[in-house]
Design a protein with these regions (language model features):
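Amphipathic alpha-helical oligomerization/assembly segments
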Residues: 248, 252-255
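Catalytic Zn2+-binding segment of zinc metalloproteases
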Residues: 158-178
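A structural motif
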Residues: 172-193
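Short pre-active-site segment immediately N-terminal to the catalytic Zn-binding motif
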Residues: 90, 136-153, 200
Length: 269
């Protein structure tokens, strides 16, 4: 185990430098970083949800992050996709229709694969990227226990992560949190890396994804009810924990507050 962690340490030390360099500058006058962005940034994107662009723009950093993500989560994701049920119109017609509708609403033309799996407990969904391929994972309870609008919010949320390119950084953020807990030596380094820039961006990325979910759902009452259910359905298995139980993951009340502000702005336009 120690040998593996040592390799991980060497692998992301360069990433530390990239994060540090991308956030350098005086607080009052932050340094402007030129970033090559996608041809079209969705209108729902949170105004601060551009931090990770400057990091992933570095080819070496991007390759390192992908290598780390694949090494430590690739096998888990492969097992999930092999043992789960791939979404088709035949096996989950209602979910399939809702997914197609969300893709149309968000203008997602390259549809990611969706798998329904028992590895996620309760009402849960997760978007990941392995070998440059985005995948959406859904729990069985999300299929049978949610109505159409609730499913659309959940699917739209994950599609928002994919559309903005969040998955790779989310995966590595989970790994770094895990390393921080396991290796005392890495504590100060990982804490500086995670708590200051990455966790701040991580929370912002959730606000953006919630906006995407709203675009697909268009019903705040549905979202409020769903958030109440999610608060009482915390994930318990190890596969879930790297994302949902992270200190960076914003509280439901905070997410709802931010989303309500966004909806109010839309209605006032």
């Amino acid at each position: 185990m120690q040998e593996i962690l040592n390799k991980a340490y060497k692998g992301f030390m360069g990433v530390v430098d990239s994060f540090a360099n991308s956030t350098a500058g005086e607080p009052s006058k932050p340094k402007k970083i030129e970033v090559v962005k996608p041809a079209s940034i969705p209108d729902y994107a949170y105004s601060c949800d551009n931090y990770i662009d400057s990091v992933l723009e570095n080819k070496l950093t991007r390759q390192t992050l992908r290598a780390i993500a694949t090494k430590y989560y690739g096998q888990q994701i492969e097992e999930v996709t092999q043992n789960g049920s791939k979404l088709t119109e035949k096996n989950y017609p209602r979910l399939f229709a809702n997914f197609q509708d969300c893709c149309k609403t968000l203008n997602v033309t390259n549809h990611p694969k969706v798998f329904v799996t028992s590895r996620l407990t309760g009402i849960n969904a997760l978007s990941v990227e392995i070998e440059k391929e985005p995948i959406v994972l859904l729990s069985y309870m999300s299929v049978i226990g949610l109505n159409d609008l609730e499913q659309k919010f959940l699917l739209g949320h994950e599609l928002g992560h994919i559309q903005l390119g969040h998955m790779l950084a989310h995966t590595v953020q989970g790994l770094l949190n895990d390393l921080n807990k396991r290796v005392e030596l890495l504590g100060p380094i990982v804490t500086d890396l995670i708590d200051v820039p990455l966790n701040r961006w991580y929370r912002t990325s959730e606000f953006t994804a919630d906006r995407a979910g709203y675009q697909c759902c268009k019903d705040m009452n549905t979202i409020r009810c769903l958030f109440k259910r999610l608060e009482h359905d915390a994930p318990v298995n190890a596969f879930n924990q790297y994302k949902e139980l992270s200190d960076a993951y914003p509280r439901m009340s905070t997410r709802l507050e931010q989303l309500s502000k966004y909806v109010l702005i839309i209605k006032l336009k």
